[in-house]
Curated annotation (Swiss-Prot):
Name of the gene this protein is made from: tsaD
Any GO BP: tRNA threonylcarbamoyladenosine modification
Family listed: Belongs to the KAE1 / TsaD family.
Pfam family, one: TsaD
Protein name per UniProt: tRNA N6-adenosine threonylcarbamoyltransferase
Origin organism lineage: Bacteria, Pseudomonadati, Pseudomonadota, Alphaproteobacteria, Hyphomicrobiales
Length: 365
């Protein structure tokens, strides 16, 4: 193997346009040389959510410039990269088309191999880039489009242990915020309001707590929030804070039960693992401090290492896409043909049962 491999990564699956140059050294260590992300928050905030057509147009307008900026920041030219990695799914099909077609064009023009990357795999492998984790480990992905507990056995080897049967957790945060008249994105707005609220004022449900299966459900909690708000309308600022705090507490207690059962299962299935077992958290909701504290305490109780990559690498970014490509290259996996097509739905675990449920990105992958 050469002393290092260098990849250009491209990410356009939802409402962030991103490009990155990442290096994998011969010892397996990863290094982010440049990482450029352009958020579309302003374009979508007036609509209270992501508008697919607007997102796709924004990717078209920004991506070429971001690729140039990523190369400039890294001090390299296209000739210096070993491959191109572009998100191919899951996500909004318009955005995926923009990023994948750009990746194909660059790969063709520069004579470089193309790796079409599963966005979820990027999240799953990020902890190996940031913390050098060894396989296997558990990953909790909590975002606007996905809520999944996944066993990460190896590159390309994923086993879904739990998923949402209805709303994704990030979607529940956004809808709660919208119901209460809080700004988009809803996650930070709910968290900020909750800091001033009484988490015990409203006894909100904790969906699926106590069940042996490791799946999640948040639609009932969202409905309970609506009922609580309607019952005391019109809402004062303190009412809103109390509802947010109660909602956040219910979410944290639900995750504590669901993930706690997952950690116990991991110990049973991997009793002789070398070193400390690990739980990785990824996705935009992973920025929530109460959720992080809950998961940290849970890991401490079960003897797990809690790994939360920096916030900028928990949300959508191109560094994780580049790294996933590097992981595949390092294993000698074949590059993708330029005819590869984007996939709006692309589960990490292809053998897992498809559950009913729709989030911002459509059917749960």
């Amino acid at each position: 193997m050469p002393p290092f491999l260098r990849i250009l990564g491209i990410e356009t699956s939802c409402d962030e346009t991103a490009a990155s140059i990442v290096v994998r050294h011969a010892d397996g260590r990863g290094e982010i040389v440049s990482d450029v992300v352009l958020s579309q928050l302003e374009e979508h905030s007036a609509y209270g959510g992501v508008v697919p057509e607007i997102a796709a147009r924004a990717h078209v307008e920004a991506l070429d410039t971001l690729v140039e900026e990523a190369l400039d920041q890294a001090g390299v030219k296209l000739a210096d990269v070993d491959a191109i990695a572009a998100t191919s799914g899951p996500g909004l099909i318009g955005g995926l088309l923009v990023g994948l077609m750009t990746g194909k064009a660059i790969a063709k023009a520069a004579g470089k191999p193309l790796y079409a990357i599963n966005h979820l795999e990027g999240h799953a492998l990020t902890a190996r880039l940031t913390d050098g984790l060894s396989f296997p480990y558990l990953m909790l992905l909590v975002s606007g489009g996905h809520t999944q507990l996944v066993l990460v056995r190896g590159v390309g080897e994923y086993e879904r242990w739990g998923t949402t049967i209805d709303d994704a957790l990030g979607e529940a945060f956004d809808k709660t915020a919208k119901l209460l008249g809080l700004p988009y994105p809803g996650g930070p707005a709910v968290e900020n309001a909750a800091a001033k609220g009484d988490p015990d004022r409203f006894p909100l449900p904790r969906p699926m707590v106590g069940e042996a299966r490791l799946d999640f459900s948040f639609s009932g909690l969202k409905t309970a929030v609506r009922q609580a708000a309607t019952a005391i309308a019109p809402l004062s600022e303190q009412d809103i804070a109390d509802i947010c705090a109660s909602f956040q507490k219910a979410v944290s207690r639900t995750l504590k039960d669901r993930i706690g059962r997952g950690l116990a299962r991991f110990k049973v299935e991997f009793p002789h693992i070398n070193g400390e077992p690990a739980l990785v958290v990824a996705g935009g909701v992973a920025a929530n401090q109460e959720i992080r504290q809950t998961l940290q305490a849970l890991c401490d109780t079960h003897g797990f290492r809690f790994v939360a990559p920096p916030h900028r690498l928990c949300t959508d970014n191109a560094a994780m896409i580049a790294w996933a490509g590097l992981e595949r290259m390092a294993e000698g996996r074949q590059a993708d043909a330029l005819e590869v097509a984007p996939r709006s739905r692309w589960p990490l675990d292809g053998s897992a049962e498809t559950l009913i449920g729709f989030g911002k990105r459509g059917a749960k992958a």
